[in-house]
Amino acid sequence: GSWGAHVRGLNRLHQFDKVEIVQIENEKNSENALNEMCDYVESLIKSLEISYRKILLCAGDLGFASSITYDFEVFAPGQKRWLECSSVSNFKTYQSNRMNLKIKKNKDKVLAHTLNGSALALPRIVATILETHQNKNVFKALVN
């Protein structure tokens, strides 16, 4: 197990809430679907007015099933470090092949492309909002 200051509080919980986003697409729309999902996550983070970065994972850091993955990290100023809050991946046909998930293409049936991601990991987002939007112990109201 891990121990230390970097794994306490809202950073490492045994259970945490998040919203998953999923798309099932054909090969032609797969890349666009990934971009739409990334744009959605970015719009959520931007609306919270917190610093973030989008990282394209290298092949060595990808999960076994993933073809391409983008991680989103938010900066927690109180901790002076970046916290991963979202990960969006395209698995192409890896998952659909295992569950025989097919879609119609003309008169044929072909394997679908599956994409998924966590919209936002709530504890880390809450921690970052609290650290970013405080002003002399009075929290700014986030409007919108």
Place the predicted regions along the sequence by residue.
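TRNA-recognition modules of translation machinery and tRNA-sensing kinases, especially anticodon-binding
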Residues: 1-144
